[in-house]
């Protein structure tokens, strides 16, 4: 779909998840997106006994990347807006007029933290550049 044909207001965007479950991406990996209504996929999962709702963005290679990963501040992409929906609308602006976008993973940041139950976990945050 061409960018000028895409209507972002038709997309349902759920809030961010507490704990991102993500595919193992590495520095140098490329993600290709083709703009369509179907690339925005609402998800629901129970994580640590709590039901979480979020939105995944599907790549052309059928990899799901959470909207919170793609709209996180300081992730290398220049996005505007305060809410995930506003920042996703800004993400759509990165697409070419033909409706395609290629991102390259430039860094994987890992942060260790202690969960409420005392167990240890690691969060992984991605940094990107438009390829």
Regions inferred by a protein language model and the residue ranges of each:
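OB-fold/S1-family single-stranded nucleic acid-binding modules
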Residues: 106-131
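Oxidizing extracytosolic/periplasmic lumen-facing domains
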Residues: 43, 94-95, 113
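GIY-YIG-like beta-to-alpha core
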Residues: 65-87
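Beta-strand-rich binding-surface signature
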Residues: 54, 100-102, 123-125
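OB-fold and OB-like beta-barrel modules that bind single-stranded nucleic acids
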Residues: 33-35, 100-107
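OB-fold ssDNA-binding interfaces and closely related basic DNA-contact patches used
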Residues: 1-71, 117, 129-130
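Short nucleic-acid-contacting surface segments enriched for D/E, G, S/T with interspersed K/R
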Residues: 26, 82-104
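Short His-Asn-centered micro-motif
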Residues: 60, 80-82, 106
């Amino acid at each position: 779909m061409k960018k000028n044909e895409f209507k972002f207001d038709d997309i349902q965007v759920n809030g961010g998840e507490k704990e991102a479950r993500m595919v193992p991406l590495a520095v140098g990996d490329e993600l290709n997106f083709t703009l369509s209504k179907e690339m925005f996929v609402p998800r629901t999962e129970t994580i640590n006994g709590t039901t979480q709702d979020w939105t995944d963005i599907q790549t052309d290679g059928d990899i799901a990347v959470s909207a919170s990963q793609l709209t996180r501040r300081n992730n290398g992409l220049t996005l505007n807006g305060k809410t995930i929906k506003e920042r996703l609308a800004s993400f759509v602006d990165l697409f070419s007029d033909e409706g395609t976008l290629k991102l390259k993973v430039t860094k994987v940041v890992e942060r260790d933290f202690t969960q409420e139950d005392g167990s240890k976990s690691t969060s992984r945050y991605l940094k990107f550049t438009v390829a």
